[in-house]
Amino acid sequence: MTPGELRRLYLIIRVFLSYGLDELIPRIRLTWPLRFGRYLLFWIPNRHKDKSLGERLRLALQELGPVWIKFGQMLSTRRDLFPPAIADQLALLQDRVASFDGALARQYIETALGGALETWFDDFEPIALASASIAQVHTARLKENGQEIVIKVIRPDILPIIKADIRLMYRLANWVPMLLPDGRRLRPREVVREYEKTLIDELNLLREAANAIQLRRNFENSSTLYVPEIYSDYCRENVLVMERVYGIPVSDIEALEAQNTNMRLLAERGVQVFFTQVFRDSFFHADMHPGNIFVSYEHPEDPFYIGIDYGIVGSLNKDDKRYLAENFIAFFNRDYRKVAELHVDSGWVPSDTNVEDFEFAIRTVCEPIFEKPLAEISFGHVLLNLFNTARRFNMAVQPQLVLLQKTLLYVEGLGRQLYPQLDLWKTAKPFLEEWLHSQVGLPAVIRALKEKVPYWAEKLPELPELVYDSLQQHKHLQVSIEKLSGHLRGQQIKQRQSQYLLGVGATLFLCGSLFLLSGLANIPWLFIGAGTVSWLFGWCRLCKI
């Protein structure tokens, strides 16, 4: 480790010990060096004994800074790693940090765009509207048309900090399999790698701009979700310019109720937006926490959402979508055999998995869920239970499914916060069944034909020539095969002749040797000579084949 990494590691250890997180060290023989190290650092007491372990972990991550805050947020979705009480506390982590100087933000924007700010913008506000660990936002107006906008700027020098902490996380991840009995199954390096990819993606605002443009296109003229316009002419890797929007934070229940918002419709539309993104578009906003979702002031009786911050998105391929939809329907029909078979068929678990054992494990974990009324069953926790059970059967980490699970938990939590009686299954089931129906049977065949018609119409004039070329190739192939077959037959004949000559030569040589041993004078040498000539001739023929 470098001196800088050692200093950072000591700071992390000191913060963890001051929150009593040495309790997380398992009391097994392999961890005695860590427990002994705790005794050596006796001057760092636990100053938060009155708080629960989960709360202490959350506070420690907040003290370590933005990189660790985001890491904790990601870990909150991996409930196979922690007990529910700890995972719930990690989900409360807030990514809020002090803003950096507005003059520095102006300088960064001007450097990125290659000119004075006033060339493109008016009324630039140097005080940040919002600030997070990766970037902060300033308000302004477009000079060309007076449109209100926000300018998002990546924090200066954030990349070296992220890379340094990620390197340290990888080193710590290498220790986990050695210190925890179940450490290898948890795949700590994959967890860190997934987090690293998420962070690096968030640092590229051109990627976020492209994501927002795609989502805006998907929900053009939608009555459920509004995506602000992106002004791509002014976007760079570290600067993003988008339309400024106004709305009520979705978590501000009092404000929503004060304007008589239709809460039931709003909650149901949140579910519809999520499933539309996942199954219709295969492209979903994967960071739908309350800070990124607003509700329009307009038409409270017919409310719609406004989404921001598209740095993290997810996508599912066609097979994943089908297996996921069938999994949900099979689960709510309590067909655990079908759930187990779908996991194997999809490749989510190894093909040699014992389906009977897997079915029993799913039944054991999931059957108690149905003791509750259907309206109280958590979709997100259903998915979570399924994945946690599957991981015991060596289910590989599926980043797209982890993102989906996290997003579903957000959507469901928001929906029930808005309207506690929300029956998510009742809202989602018609959508899933309709989508599955569209993927199989006559509608799917007709759609596939429609998609292929332009291609075949383009290729139709070429069809006679293609058929002729194919027949000619077939004819030439037949001639080549016949020539090759004849050549192979000739080679086989030569090989048999050579083997025969080798055998004859060896026999004559052996006979001559025996005659020589019996005391005969000239005859043995005749046999030996003939055998040697025959053997050499056969060998030469064999070498030429």
UniProtKB/Swiss-Prot annotation:
Domain of life the protein comes from: Bacteria
Regions crossing the membrane: 508-528
Binding site for ATP: 129-137, 152
Catalytic residues (UniProt): 287 (proton acceptor)
EC number: 2.7.-.-
Primary location: membrane
Protein kinase domain span: 123-501
InterPro entries, sorted: ABC1_dom, Kinase-like_dom_sf, UbiB, UbiB_bact, UbiB_kinase
Gene Ontology MF annotations: ATP binding; protein kinase activity
Protein's UniProt name: Probable protein kinase UbiB
Source organism of this protein record: Photorhabdus laumondii subsp. laumondii (strain DSM 15139 / CIP 105565 / TT01)
Gene of this entry: ubiB
